[in-house]
Regions:
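Acidic, metal/ion-coordinating pockets
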Residues: 81
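Metzincin-family zinc-dependent endopeptidase catalytic domain
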Residues: 1-74, 78, 99-103, 113-116
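Conserved catalytic/binding loops enriched for acidic/polar residues
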Residues: 84-86, 90-230, 234
């Protein structure tokens, strides 16, 4: 298939909330898509991805991210486009922060790879990829599926569930931002962005694209890479 996508559909009984059936569908060309993402977003900072074919272990990490995201959908998690919007941009160049949190607090965000990291950052220990699971994801799954044995009815669960929400309400790691379609009214809930300052983040991204355009022929000139070079130019 030439489709570059994956899905995590599920069938849910509206009477009980029980997930009756769920599956993860992965189209073949997702392999090419995740390679594009990794190359175009992180090649300036990562010598290991400066090729048209990713090393198997690196490609496996990229696919694992996609699969984890889709499994999240099968478990009823919606897109959380606020996953990275509360992270200070400079924290995404900080080794300690990125090793703990990656690029986002939720893999249900569209926060792919760390395009803010600059050449030399990886050598300092900066992580360039999303987390396996984010703080929000662990919390959301716990909220959805932790048994509340003291509650005898669904109605009795509500105060406890509300309490769990209140306990995290002041912590930006657990913020949720609904995906916006057609019109964007909330700048903190946007696809494909990183960090809390879009101007600063875009400036770092621009520097990386300039670096990539300057060196791309040195990295892949002897390969069949028309798509890579044209995407970089676009």
């Amino acid at each position: 298939s030439t489709v570059a996508n994956a899905m995590g559909p599920s069938w849910i009984d509206p009477r009980s909330g029980e997930i009756i059936n769920a599956s993860v569908t992965v189209f073949h060309n997702i392999v090419q898509l995740v390679q594009y993402w990794r190359f175009l977003q992180t090649a300036p900072a990562d010598e290991e991805v400066r090729d048209v074919v990713l090393r198997e272990d690196l490609l496996g990490d990229c696919i694992a991210y996609v699969l984890s995201h889709e499994v999240g959908h099968t478990l009823s998690l919606m897109h959380n486009m606020a996953g990275s919007s509360s992270i200070p941009v400079e924290s995404l160049r900080d080794p300690k922060f990125t090793q703990e949190f990656g690029t986002t607090y939720s893999i249900m965000d569209y926060a792919r790879n760390n395009y803010i990291a600059q050449p030399g950052d990886k050598e300092r220990g900066v992580r360039l990829t999303p987390p396996e699971l984010g703080a929000y994801d662990y919390y959301a799954i716990a909220w959805l599926y932790t048994p509340i044995f003291e509650a005898k009815t669904a109605e009795e669960e509500i105060p406890i569930l509300d309490k769990w929400i209140s306990e995290k309400s002041g912590d930006v790691k657990y913020r949720y931002g609904k995906q916006q379609f057609r019109r964007r009214f909330d700048p903190s809930s946007v696809e494909e962005d990183l960090g809390d300052d879009p101007v600063k983040a875009s400036e770092y991204g621009r520097r990386n694209l300039q670096y990539l355009l300057k060196h791309i022929n040195d990295w892949v000139a002897d390969k069949d890479c028309l798509l890579y070079t044209s995407d970089a130019a676009d």
